[in-house]
Curated annotation (Swiss-Prot):
Transmembrane intervals: 4-24
Name by which UniProt lists this protein: Biofilm-associated metzincin protease inhibitor
Biased composition (Basic and acidic residues): 191-204
Signal peptide residue numbers: none
Region (Disordered), start-end ranges: 191-219
Highest classification ranks of the organism: Bacteria, Pseudomonadati, Pseudomonadota, Gammaproteobacteria, Pseudomonadales
Length: 219
């Protein structure tokens, strides 16, 4: 009888211990939503996450790049070297030159234009100092580099021709440039003065602002 009671007490103690241990064990942590997903769902989500970062980088790469306009050249040589001459209207010589047409599209204030002219040992240099419109045509004006204040250069841009007038202490020049081909004709006003008095000595044309040339040919 005593043994039976002891066995019953031992069984009760062991059962109580097991129940207490079960009550004291912490509940297993709840799985995260990602862990609860099936392996197939996780495998499908992985490529989407991997593509998200490159897509953002691609968006940044496709952002428009600011367009920068190149600065105008400080010095432009329209033509250089000795000019070829031919007899023009009324026997007055014309001197021929060749200009790169694109150069006349890049005129800018402060720019120095350089060109060789008949009767001058060194190329003429003139700096563009002002611009305005006259009769709908752009006009540029400037003075000679290291020249006298009375010396000047005027450029009138037409759609077909560009007219350039140069006034120096030694005489004046009229220049006509074909905008499309760049072919250029230079007329020395001293030749016109000599033509008016063929029997006299060579006389430099007086320094003066040239009378307006006919407007450049328009399309």
């Amino acid at each position: 009888m005593a043994k039976t009671w002891i066995y019953a007490a031992s069984a009760a103690a062991i059962g109580g211990a097991l129940i207490g241990g079960w009550l004291l064990d912490p509940a297993p942590p709840e799985a995260s939503p990602q862990a609860r997903q099936s392996p197939a769902a996780q495998a499908a989500a992985a490529p989407t996450a991997a593509l998200a970062a490159p897509a953002a980088d691609a968006t940044r790469m496709l952002a428009p790049t600011p367009v920068t306009t190149p600065a105008p050249r400080e010095r432009v040589t329209l033509w250089q070297g000795e000019l070829r001459s031919r007899e023009g209207a009324q026997g007055i010589p014309e001197y021929l030159a060749q200009v790169e047409p694109a150069l006349l599209d890049t005129l800018a204030l402060g720019q120095v234009l350089e060109m060789s002219l008949p009767g001058r040992e060194r190329p003429l240099q003139a700096r563009l100092a002002s611009t305005h419109n006259s009769a709908g045509l752009p006009v540029w004006r400037g003075g000679l580099v290291d020249g006298d204040e009375a010396e000047s250069l005027t450029v009138v841009r037409g759609s077909l021709e560009t007219h350039i007038n140069v006034a120096t202490l030694d005489g004046s020049y009229s220049i006509i440039v074909d905008n499309r081909s760049g072919k250029t004709r230079v007329i020395d006003e001293n030749d016109i003065a000599a033509r008016s008095d063929p029997h006299g000595d060579h006389v430099d044309a007086p320094l003066a602002e040239l009378p307006p040339m006919p407007p450049p040919a328009q399309g």
